[in-house]
Amino acid sequence: MFNLNQTKKASLPIKMRIRKGDTVQVINGKEKGKTGEVLKTLPIENRVIVQGINLRTRHVKPTQEGESGRIVTEEASLHASNVMVYSTKQKTASRVEVFIDKDGSKKRRLKKTGELID
């Protein structure tokens, strides 16, 4: 027999090449073509939250007496496969390549343009 109330086994975080602060472009879905800054990454779920993209309205109940309820608009997460890092200089989206620099440190660069991200 199996238990229907079993929770999903916690998975390990995925190594993401997108980081907080990166400018990304949405490549799939209803927000396709829009760009924004990554506010937060969720590596266990392989998702990102992008500023001004995938907005959802949420109704918030009052928490204290005398306070009224309100409607809050906030960003919902997107799957990381639906965004690409965007170069503001070249105005193009590209995949990210991780390479080891001459001094032995790991760096990220755009595959299409060769531009260093950090």
From Swiss-Prot:
| Native organism taxonomy | Bacteria, Bacillati, Cyanobacteriota, Cyanophyceae, Synechococcales
| Protein name (Swiss-Prot/TrEMBL) | Large ribosomal subunit protein uL24
Alphabetic keyword roster: Ribonucleoprotein, Ribosomal protein, RNA-binding, rRNA-binding
**Domain of life according to the entry:** Bacteria
Q: Does the keyword NADP apply?
A: no
Q: Does the keyword Kinase apply?
A: no
User: Would you indicate the residue range of the signal peptide?
Assistant: none
PANTHER family, alphabetized: MITOCHONDRIAL RIBOSOMAL PROTEIN L24
Q: Which InterPro entries match?
A: KOW, Rib_uL2_dom2, Ribosomal_uL24, Ribosomal_uL24_CS, Ribosomal_uL24_KOW, Translation_prot_SH3-like_sf
Q: What is the protein's species of origin?
A: Prochlorococcus marinus (strain SARG / CCMP1375 / SS120)
Task: Provide a GO biological process annotation.
Answer: translation
Q: Name one Pfam family in it.
A: ribosomal_L24
Q: Name one GO cellular component term.
A: ribosome
- NCBIfam families assigned: rplX_bact
Query: Entry's CDD domains?
Result: KOW_RPL26 (cd06089)
